[in-house]
Amino acid sequence: MIKDCLSDSVTLYQGDALNILATLPDAVMAAVLTDPPYSSGGVTMGARQTDPAQKYQQSGTKRQYPPMLGDAKDQRSWTMWCTLWLGECWRVARDGAPLMVFTDWRQLPALSDAVQAAGWSWRGIIAWDKRSSRPQIGKFRQQCEYVLFATKGRFVARTRTCLPGLYSYPVIAVHKVHLTSKPVALIEDLLAITAPQASVLDPFMGGGSVGEACIRTGRKYVGMELSQEYYDISRNRLTALLEAEK
């Protein structure tokens, strides 16, 4: 495990999220917002074990990204694995803390089971309209992904604003540093449910979009990443942003 404190408000870990989460004390995080590997992209084991670039990129895309780790689990093992790390997140979260986890339509039912099995109180689903997706002749486009929203116990409002349940942002290829990068503006919108300067836990840092959104909105950030390649990408990205904001 590697630990880097980039600033008083940004701490990064390189290693397995379950192992790292076990080292954190109870009830220290104000929120959890993360984008774990979906282990999706097919209904058979063979399809799930396909190269993530083939599962999640539209045909004709030329840009190559570092490989994703942990994206080939079958649904039952994925659900059990999610229950484990979600349980650790519940332990380190404060009472009333919000949980927001990205998923797709295939894994939404399994994720909702894991969230509740881990002790969280399920509060709803937020839709992210990507505005486009791979076309399927004779079928509806799968152009939405979802954010499962839950809390640790009783919901505690941190804002007087009424937040929408649908956000529409395109995926802009030139802004992506990860195969499944989420728009930073979308993350910033989701963070509106947290208090200013809240500490946000992200066990699956990927390309660092949640970290960037936290820095830009004045939140504290704790990010974890298994892949050394993506850890280096995120560390460099967030270091540059912190330097630019001095």
Model-identified regions with their sequence ranges:
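Core catalytic lobe of class I
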Residues: M1-D232
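Short, conserved SAM-binding/catalytic segment
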Residues: M1-S7, R235-K246
